């Protein structure tokens, strides 16, 4: 499935009823009741969702156990695995003890470790995204749902000119800590250092008569992380090169460095962590792009939205592959709706004006061999009694084809130079019409 979950276990007995819990976000709290065995368990995720309590149905006061709370300091800390033991308690085979293993430490053991069968999971590069098992009076059995730690990265760009003898391309294992820029009227060169002290570059700077002035950006990875870049590219001394650059973190914007001239570029992106750069260089920095990975465990990145500020916000995330898009369009986009391979239909976003509903268009996507990778389109003013800023045209791009444009193109266009990704959802604003639209993407290695 798109979610890429693996089920491990359960361990324990066959009593009680089956249960399962899959977190929408990272698991941040586990509450257990425990004495000589695990009486009950419940979970909370980063969005504040609580799972309900599994077990703990023995009505006797002396069987309630003591409450223990494990807090996981996501996103720096995340749950990787569990271990424990199961054995006889009051004539029932149940979970006797449990430990919770994160990337930083082990919490536990909780309960009685003497006797019974122990279990552990020799697993690496995993994130626990849910639990399953059996429960009734006590916690009879327990297993986990895991995902791989998302190593997958998405490439944006490059932006700039086509020249440059030296291509560069790197990804870091930690975070980008220092950026050293030489710039004057353009970006002469750039170099990077990661948190482990590895250096990348210098890229560019081969004109001995024009090296620029040194500037340095320092990023404290505990509080601040690089999430995007923006800049301009254009003609400098007869070359098409990057003329200015800014580095956008979750805290601030560093820059611009150089002098803005020519064509501007930016990428409205959230939930992202820049893990590397790519591009070309020679005398100057000819072009630059970024590698990003999802900052959160669930692994989707939000891009956009583009369009107007009217209507109400909406969002849709598919359970499986998106295989159908229904667009009502005329001189603008009236509404969109989506369907995925699990048969889940989204709501219709837009289309509230009954006097202006447009023509129906259906895009069918032959998932899994074909999958949605991006969108492009235009937005601008649309008049029906009042004037609205809405999405006026839309195209949908898959790994195989582009469908559209639907609607009628207007002045302001948008597109996303993006690779190695899959669209897993949409968001935006809508009311009488489709006011704005953006996408949620994942690295396609997560398919």
Curated annotation (Swiss-Prot):
Region of interest (3 X approximate tandem repeats), residue spans: 1-447
Name the record gives this protein: Mannose/glucose-specific lectin
InterPro entries in the cross-refs: Jacalin-like_lectin_dom, Jacalin-like_lectin_dom_plant, Jacalin-like_lectin_dom_sf
GO molecular function term, any single one: D-mannose binding
Additional observations: PubMed:11502201 authors report the absence of the blocked N-terminal residue, together with 3 to 5 amino acids from the N-terminal part of the protein.
Family under the similarity heading: Belongs to the jacalin lectin family.
CDD domains registered for this protein in UniProt: Jacalin (cd09612)
A Pfam family the protein falls into: Jacalin
Transmembrane segments: none
């Amino acid at each position: 499935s798109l979610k890429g979950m693996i089920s491990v276990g359960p361990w324990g007995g066959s009593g009680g009823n089956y249960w399962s819990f899959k977190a929408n976000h990272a698991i941040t709290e586990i509450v257990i009741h425990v004495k000589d065995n695990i009486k009950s368990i419940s979970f909370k995720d980063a969005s504040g969702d609580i799972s309900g309590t599994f077990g703990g149905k023995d009505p006797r006061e002396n069987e309630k156990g003591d409450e223990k709370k494990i807090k996981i300091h996501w996103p720096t800390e995340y749950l990787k695995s569990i271990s424990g033991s199961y054995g006889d308690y009051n004539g029932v085979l149940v979970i006797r003890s449990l430990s919770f293993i994160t990337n930083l430490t082990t919490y536990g053991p909780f309960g009685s470790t003497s006797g019974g069968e122990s279990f552990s999971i020799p697993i690496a590069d995993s994130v626990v995204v849910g639990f399953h098992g059996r429960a009734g009076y006590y916690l009879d059995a327990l297993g986990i749902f895991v995902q791989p730690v998302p190593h997958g990265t998405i490439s944006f760009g490059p932006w700039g000119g086509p020249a440059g003898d030296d291509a560069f391309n790197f990804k870091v294992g930690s975070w980008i800590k220092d950026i050293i820029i030489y710039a004057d009227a353009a970006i002469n060169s750039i170099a990077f250092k990661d948190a482990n002290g590895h250096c990348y570059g210098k890229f560019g700077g081969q004109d001995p008569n024009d090296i620029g002035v040194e500037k340095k950006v320092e990023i404290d990875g505990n509080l601040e992380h690089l999430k995007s870049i923006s800049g301009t590219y254009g003609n400098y001394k007869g070359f098409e090169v990057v003329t200015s650059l800014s580095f956008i973190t979750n805290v601030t914007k560093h820059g611009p460095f150089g002098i803005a001239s020519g064509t501007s570029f930016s990428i409205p992106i959230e939930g992202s962590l820049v893990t590397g750069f790519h591009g070309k260089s020679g005398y100057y920095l000819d072009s630059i792009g970024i590698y990003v990975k999802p900052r959160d465990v669930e692994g989707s990145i939000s891009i956009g939205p583009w369009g107007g500020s009217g209507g109400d916000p909406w969002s849709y995330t598919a359970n499986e592959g998106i295989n159908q898009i229904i667009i009502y369009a005329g001189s603008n986009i009236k509404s969109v709706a989506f369907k995925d391979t699990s048969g889940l239909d989204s709501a219709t976003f837009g289309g509230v004006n009954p006097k202006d509903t447009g023509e129906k268009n259906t895009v069918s996507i032959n998932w899994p061999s074909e999958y949605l990778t991006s969108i492009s389109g235009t937005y601008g003013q649309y008049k029906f009694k009042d004037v609205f800023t809405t999405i006026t045209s839309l195209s949908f791009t898959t790994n195989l084809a582009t469908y559209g444009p639907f609607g009628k193109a207007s002045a302001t266009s948008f597109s996303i130079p993006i690779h190695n990704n899959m669209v897993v959802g949409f968001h935006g604003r809508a009311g009488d019409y489709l006011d704005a639209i953006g996408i949620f993407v994942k690295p396609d290695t997560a398919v």
